[in-house]
Amino acid sequence: MLEQGLLVTAGVAFLISVALSPLFIPFLRKLKFGQSIRDEGPKSHQKKSGTPTMGGIVIYVSMMVTSLIMAIKFNHLGAEVSLLLLVTFGYGLIGFLDDYIKVVKKRNLGLTSKQKLVGQLVIAIAFFLIGKGQAFHTYIMIPGTDVKFELGWAYFVLVLFMLIGGSNAVNLTDGLDGLLSGTAAIAFGAFSIIAVAQEQFGVAIFCMAVVGAVLGFLVFNANPAKVFMGDTGSLALGGAIAAVAILLKQELLLVIIGGVFVMETLSVIIQVISFKTTGKRVFKMSPLHHHYELCGWSEWRVVVTFWSVGFLLAVLGIYIGVWM
């Protein structure tokens, strides 16, 4: 019965997202909340300038409302769901402020790095202090085994790293039409299956609400995108997926299921280190998806390829997390 409820959860979130988007996009246009495009980015992206951004509000509302209602309906509104809603709200708010500054102040960089980091730290610390001992414990498990390592207060550092790093990694992936929407749906779908296997149905409900919300948004975000999610959506999704991995005790498995996000982040780190130490760039441009664009791949080809890689990694993650 609950498995059917999970499908209903995804369906409801999808319908809300699809229904809200056509109403919200003209509203964003009226407010002139259009995305500005970096001059140093691929030239093909200049035509996207002015496309409405902050569409992540649609994802945010769809998944928050649906997960809350369905968790209450199935009596699974526990500490886990509450923590997930807290992280999603907190990181979504940071993203909203970042987007607002970009579109209103016409500053493409939005919040300063320091301002963003402070906000992310506050949310991560609150997550740890509220959840420790109640929703999760301070050990990590080796995926596919019963081996666990108690980290004690070192786990606090891991939580901060995962939430801040996860939100920024997902944010880096949001550079092509539909890229993040598709990869996020795949990753959250994988974690929902693992959550069901662990009988953590509240977490599963939340994950399926995200799947439905981002797939509904993808209808309008696929190439050519009518709207971008902005940091409002990407930071919220990044913080949420890291929190899900922590609550399921699949911290290490996040590296596999979120492999696309990891590759995007590593490409930026490698690029920066290489340029600062040798004066040469490893990639034509980072994050990685832009490298393939400049290699002559069409935007759609890059997106579908990354979706495919994300799907294969998700299947591997499910196999390790459920059947090994």
From Swiss-Prot:
EC assignment: the record states 2.7.8.13
Topology versus the membrane: Multi-pass membrane protein
- Catalysis performed (reactions): UDP-N-acetyl-alpha-D-muramoyl-L-alanyl-gamma-D-glutamyl-meso-2,6-diaminopimeloyl-D-alanyl-D-alanine + di-trans,octa-cis-undecaprenyl phosphate = di-trans,octa-cis-undecaprenyl diphospho-N-acetyl-alpha-D-muramoyl-L-alanyl-D-glutamyl-meso-2,6-diaminopimeloyl-D-alanyl-D-alanine + UMP
> Where does this protein act, in terms of pathway?
Cell wall biogenesis; peptidoglycan biosynthesis
Signal peptide per UniProt:
none
Which CDD domains does its entry note? GT_MraY (cd06852)
Q: List the InterPro entries.
A: Glycosyl_transferase_4, PNAcMuramoyl-5peptid_Trfase, PNAcMuramoyl-5peptid_Trfase_CS
Q: Any idea which UniProt keywords this protein has?
A: Cell cycle, Cell division, Cell membrane, Cell shape, Cell wall biogenesis/degradation, Magnesium, Membrane, Metal-binding, Peptidoglycan synthesis, Transferase, Transmembrane, Transmembrane helix
Domain of life per record: Bacteria
Q: Enumerate the subcellular locations listed in this protein's record, separating them with semicolons.
A: Cell membrane
Under Pfam families, the record lists: Glycos_transf_4, MraY_sig1
- Please give the start and end residues of each transmembrane region: 5-25, 52-72, 77-97, 122-142, 149-169, 176-196, 201-221, 227-247, 253-273, 302-322
What's the cofactor? Mg(2+)
The molecular function terms of the Gene Ontology recorded here are: metal ion binding; phospho-N-acetylmuramoyl-pentapeptide-transferase activity; UDP-N-acetylmuramoyl-L-alanyl-D-glutamyl-meso-2,6-diaminopimelyl-D-alanyl-D-alanine:undecaprenyl-phosphate transferase activity
Q: Name one GO cellular component term.
A: plasma membrane
Q: Which GO terms describe its biological process?
A: cell division; cell wall organization; peptidoglycan biosynthetic process; regulation of cell shape
Q: What does this protein do?
A: Catalyzes the initial step of the lipid cycle reactions in the biosynthesis of the cell wall peptidoglycan: transfers peptidoglycan precursor phospho-MurNAc-pentapeptide from UDP-MurNAc-pentapeptide onto the lipid carrier undecaprenyl phosphate, yielding undecaprenyl-pyrophosphoryl-MurNAc-pentapeptide, known as lipid I.
Into which family does the record put it? Answer: Belongs to the glycosyltransferase 4 family. MraY subfamily.
What is this protein called in UniProt? Answer: Phospho-N-acetylmuramoyl-pentapeptide-transferase
The protein's gene is named mraY
